[in-house]
Amino acid sequence: MRWCVSIAAILFAGAIAGGDVAGIAAPNPKSQSADTKDTVTSVDVELVIAVDISYSMDMDELAVQREGYAQAIVSREFLQAMKTGPNGKVALTYFEWSASNDQQIIIPWRMIDGPESADAVANEIMKTPVRRGSRTSISGAINFAMPLFDENPYRGLRRVIDISGDGANNSGPPVTGARDAALGKGIIINGLPIMVKEPSYSTMDIDNLDWYYEDCVIGGPGSFVVTIKDRDNFKEAIRTKLILEVADRTPERRAVPVTEKEPRVPCLIGEKIWQDRWGR
């Protein structure tokens, strides 16, 4: 199942007011736990952004990806969507990943509550040199992300992992085990499958990566994917996804997580391709 959604639709007057807009489900009202301590700053969402930097992505794509997140965070649409929540604030951390033991935090937990804090986070994202790593461990990224929520000084109504990637898991534990562990902790996982290149032997890309993400990676209430199929739409797709996440909205025709149906793509396809090719 494939879909697209425009930023204009998300921010159409009725949506910002809290009503339904075609293609977008209105957010469910939520309330904070009564036992939240006064000393803890409340936010609407705790968002972990987990970004793939494997060698299958070229340096230009990695640079555009970085710019996409930085520009999205400072965009008027993102800041407007953020203010639709009861707290009008989000907390986020941003890390890059490749193999099962290769994760680097670029932005530790930061609260965004307006243009000034958004600018500071965006500048921090852009100042770190772009790098690449070997192999692809989505499971490693999820396992790395989970304890970050326990270290977060802010408390949100939702906990979300936003994970991007251009290939299937081929390093570390199976992705479904990591996904299920996160779902067991009440964490939502959304996906940003990157499909701007045709699958090839040299890159270990697979057909229907969007199906793989839908059936093997994402999960939790309202989980969804935004697929990037055109390099020119890279930045808009990133912005659209972040807006949906901070506004607690999902596409009406969303993906149905694998827990509700059989996967259309084998969840161990990445491991099988690696084993067939390298024998280890």
Each PLM stretch: what is its role?
Residues 6-19:
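Bacterial N-terminal signal peptides
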Residues 226-280:
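C-terminal "exit" segments of structured domains
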Residues 18-48, 54-63, 183:
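Acidic, polar low-complexity linker/tail segments
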Residues 82, 168-215:
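VWA/integrin I-like adhesion module and closely mimicked acidic/polar interface patches used
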